[in-house]
Amino acid sequence: MVPRLLLRAWPRGPAVGPGAPSRPLSAGSGPGQYLQRSIVPTMHYQDSLPRLPIPKLEDTIRRYLSAQKPLLDDGQFRKTEQFCKNFENGIGKELHEQLVAQDKQNKHTSYISGPWFDMYLSARDSVVLNFNPFMAFNPDPKSEYNDQLTRATNMTVSAIRFLKTLRDGLLEPEVFHLNPAKSDTDTFKRLIRFVPSSLSWYGAYLVNAYPLDMSQYFRLFNSTRLPKPSRDELFTDDKARHLLVLRKGNFYIFDVLDQDGNIVSPSEIQAHLKYILSDSSPAPEFPLAYLTSENRDIWAELRQKLMSSGNEESLRKVDSAVFCLCLDDFPIKDLVHLSHNMLHGDGTNRWFDKSFNLIIAKDGSAAVHFEHSWGDGVAVLRFFNEVFKDSTQIPAITPQSQPATADSTVTVQKLNFKLTDALKTGITAAKEKFDATMKTLTIDCLQFQRGGKEFLKKQKLSPDAVAQLAFQMAFLRQYGQTVATYESCSTAAFKHGRTETIRPASIYTKRCSEAFVREPSRHSAGELQQMMAECSKYHGQLTKEAAMGQGFDRHLFALRHLAAAKGIILPELYLDPAYGQINHNVLSTSTLSSPAVNLGGFAPVVSDGFGVGYAVHGNWIGCNVSSYPGRNAREFLQCVEKALEDMFDALEGKSIKS
């Protein structure tokens, strides 16, 4: 019913619809305070969103076994099949019934929301590389606007405009339009805003529009993940009005909203940022930011020491800041340098626990680096797109703008931290660990220029399926096997939906990959095209199922979480090595494309894996791959390129070169 909801759509055009908004605004509602003035309130659809379905247990088991088939030999598969049968007719059935009953008692949320927060917040590994991803902005099309001060000012103002637009209910609701000509119109919006919010979703559904969950948006601003022993906490203070700025590992704060909730004038923000950029303070000997890259239990203990050493107020300022702006003192050399800098940097100039860091380098290269427990990038991508659009189309200042004559020495406060010997030792240890880990990470990227979405759609193939098939072929060529593969899919079409997994490795991709890699000369171009079409069709089915909450991963995860919560001995299905193997995602993949995104990326989720960020554009395909020493990212990309060349040859009726 709904295609994959990866929120690829560029947010609607200037949404200053006719008619003033029909709700009270904050005192600061003058010109330039908002990105848009939606006539449909931002949260209009939230109450009536459908609930995330719990799949039938037999469907989950069937899908699980289908995903296991290409990964196991016949003997292993028969064992796993038996474990599944026992589970489905025994303890699994009981757990499923309990999960359904529990879900009925909690209609305000989804069955996955609580367990998913638990999973993220209980993880003790560093958030850096293990969880936090990044998305890099395209440069401003007007090159002179890429000056660091100009871009930092414009992006900060646009970010605060987004905050105000969201909080005053004037941000267009996030809606996936299957037929925009019918639903993405002022006429429809004028009608739907009068439908009570308890029914509004149904009104949108009638015109093939699918409103998406926006419950994660409130954590975008003024929020931080706080380290605590055994399970972290999310902290939000939406009363705070200050911005946190990091430069050379030094911390600065100044207000970006005044007491009435107005945005401080752009020329004042420019003046304060100019003051920070020209501050000659040296980098601190013990950069505090390293601590946010530590193991969470170690960081929790050190944070307690920080608090008891007289730093409570300074930490509160860091945690409650609207967001963290990181100003880097060097230009970006190339795309690989961009990825390394935005994914981890040198550890001194990021607060990795903040809901997001907006990073701007000396040459204006910019990115959002975000903490993953509070949300899945749904809110981040919308924010990202709107900030790019606003800051490039309606910039608050020009490169010629003069900063205000504000007294930044008074307004900008530099935070100083009192460090005991124990804290200094902790920072030094964190730095050593950080530096050693980062040395092990390799990143490389590919731009395949022969074609993209337009050509593949003419061939009646899913562009995403072809990209995923290329990864399967590449891994088979490089390592001779088919491995567990993960593709993230948003379930934001449902209330408090998070993500579901698409499992791109299938019996179809395995057969097709083996034909292309091992014996291309034995097949005609027509036969290879036929196999690609089968892969595309099956991938499309998996994608649709995942977007509708009909995968198997989250359901099995929730049943396991429930068993643990009830103190039940772990069922044998979960002790089966095949279950461990399918959740050891050697290929972890994620896609997004938007006119604002230059590239995105993340680290592998296992030590012998690849982290694959990719995008299929109109006429080219981009791929950004990370690996640790156990795998070779550059060679993998050479194999991806070979796979794409071979598939394009087959589609053009040419024979495959071995």
UniProtKB/Swiss-Prot annotation:
* Domain of life of the native organism: Eukaryota
Q: Organism source for this protein?
A: Macaca fascicularis (Crab-eating macaque)
Does Membrane show up as a keyword for this record? Answer: yes
- Pathway(s) where this gene product acts: Lipid metabolism; fatty acid beta-oxidation
The similarity comment for this entry is: Belongs to the carnitine/choline acetyltransferase family.
Q: Which residues bind (R)-carnitine?
A: Y486, S488, T499
Q: Where in the cell is it found?
A: Mitochondrion inner membrane
Q: Give the protein's recorded name.
A: Carnitine O-palmitoyltransferase 2, mitochondrial
In terms of InterPro entries, this protein maps to: Carn_acyl_trans, Carn_acyl_trans_N, CAT-like_dom_sf, Cho/carn_acyl_trans, Cho/carn_acyl_trans_2
Q: Give first and last residue of the transit peptide.
A: 1-25
Q: Name one GO molecular function term.
A: carnitine O-palmitoyltransferase activity
Membrane topology value: Peripheral membrane protein
Q: EC number(s) of the enzyme?
A: 2.3.1.21
Function (record text): Involved in the intramitochondrial synthesis of acylcarnitines from accumulated acyl-CoA metabolites. Reconverts acylcarnitines back into the respective acyl-CoA esters that can then undergo beta-oxidation, an essential step for the mitochondrial uptake of long-chain fatty acids and their subsequent beta-oxidation in the mitochondrion. Active with medium (C8-C12) and long-chain (C14-C18) acyl-CoA esters.
Q: Which UniProt keywords apply?
A: Acetylation, Acyltransferase, Fatty acid metabolism, Lipid metabolism, Membrane, Mitochondrion, Mitochondrion inner membrane, Transferase, Transit peptide, Transport
